[in-house]
Amino acid sequence: MVDDVRHRARKRFGQNFLVDRQVIAAIISAIHPQPKDNLVEIGPGLGALTTPLLRLLNHLTVIEIDRDIVAQLQRDHSQDKLTIHSIDALKFDFSALGGDQRIVGNLPYNISTPLLFHLSRFCTYIRDMYFMLQKEVVERMVAEPSTSSYGRLSVMLQYRFAMEQIFTVPPESFRPVPKVESAIVVMRPLNKNAPVANDEALFSRIVTAAFSQRRKTLRNTLSAYLRGEDFNCLAIDANLRAENLTVRQYVSIADYCLSRSHK
């Protein structure tokens, strides 16, 4: 275990610090950083990943909201190799860091979902992302259609990224010890052949509406968008539920609704 736990974790920042050296080594190995990588770490905390990353990189950018941690990072590391942005990651403009970004981090559980949605806006600037998240969240991210874990988060993130759960991390690997298991997920932006909605805001509204009442059929949840004959045109069974549709089918629904509104 890493010995340095001087900083008291703050609940309002959702802080749980990774202290297991074996897990840290496994994460670094999975990331496989190269010296010239444009690598960004969100929430460096006590530097569990920061320190080994700096040994392998020419330069590292970190984003940290906790001013005490920022001060500690400034004391512990050379500013020639480390750029610190003291800001809430939810408000950070990742496009300012240029292209081909590799983003990593042990994300606070209390902001993980909104942060993933925020990052998805910058997917054209991103090569890949490696995150430690609550295991349940990762399972929802990578879930297949027609499973209980498949939901709005699955559809909206799979629309942008190919994702894979790499390995799980037990609660004992953190200080303080959380009540849940964690998992490492890798996210890579989809290539240009992936389906793209012509109106992404409409796509998002339709996905949200479909999953607003999971146990109801699409005939009910999408009644504001589709009538009986529309389901026939789309070759989609109106008696299915939201979790039964693929990302591509949601894109088809959004594009169909858009084309109909332009007639």
Give residue ranges: language-model regions:
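Primarily a LysM-type cell-wall glycan-binding module
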Residues: 214
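Conserved active-site loop/cleft motifs that coordinate metal ions or position small ligands
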Residues: 221
